[in-house]
Design a protein with these regions (language model features):
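Extracytoplasmic
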Residues: 1-195
Length: 195
């Protein structure tokens, strides 16, 4: 079973594996990997060939903030200092980034690449909905720069299965210009053991 894909070449040569069991070696990954399996039998006598195909898409555990499946109260902005040259900024109180169907049972924490020359605030990690169960939170302090990104980490309450994951931005006193977010990275039991 695959927990998270750590690396895949963006310049894929479309590798193929033939047979019932196989292994594909992959290089560094910047996005996601899509695996497709197809089976065609030979048929028999007057019976036609049978075919089946399935495809799955595996998300990297390192995600650009702007790759969110849904967003509110935030804008995609550009900067040479951001990884991938883009980040999410102009973040408002009660704004959020939503990532669809994240496998939560292996996540032990999340690292955020953030910066703030504005109001700062909190990032809440919520399960299933904007106001769903709180899994973790991190306080983003003002560091006086809009592009001096630094890493902050929060532990995540153990959860089960797959669910939509919401990163909700909070600052009731200063409702706009809270922070910028460049990327997020899910920490797992296996990544903790690597350190």
């Amino acid at each position: 079973m695959v927990e998270y894909v750590y690396s895949v070449s963006q310049d894929s040569t479309n590798p193929n594996a033939i047979g019932f069991r196989n292994e594909l070696n992959v290089a560094e990954m910047k996005g996601a990997i899509e695996l497709e399996a197809t089976y065609i039998d030979l048929g028999r006598g007057s019976l036609p060939k049978l075919a089946g195909s399935t495809k799955i898409r595996l998300r990297s555990r390192h995600l650009q903030a702007e790759s969110a499946d849904e967003m509110k109260g935030t804008q995609r902005l550009g900067s040479d200092k951001a990884e991938g040259k883009f980040f999410m900024g102009a973040i408002e109180h009660d704004g959020y980034l939503k990532y669809n169907q994240v496998r939560l049972d292996s996540i032990t924490g999340i690292t955020f690449s953030v910066t703030s020359a504005g109001a700062g605030g909190n990032i809440e990690v919520r399960k299933g909905a904007f106001d769903g169960p709180l899994l973790g939170s991190v306080k983003v302090e003002v560091n006086g720069s809009w592009d001096a990104f630094h890493d902050l980490h929060t532990k995540v309450v153990p959860s089960t299965g797959k669910s939509d994951l919401y990163l909700v931005f909070q600052n009731e006193k200063n409702r706009g210009g809270l922070m910028n977010v460049d990327w997020i990275e899910f920490q797992t039991k296996s990544t903790q053991n690597e350190k």
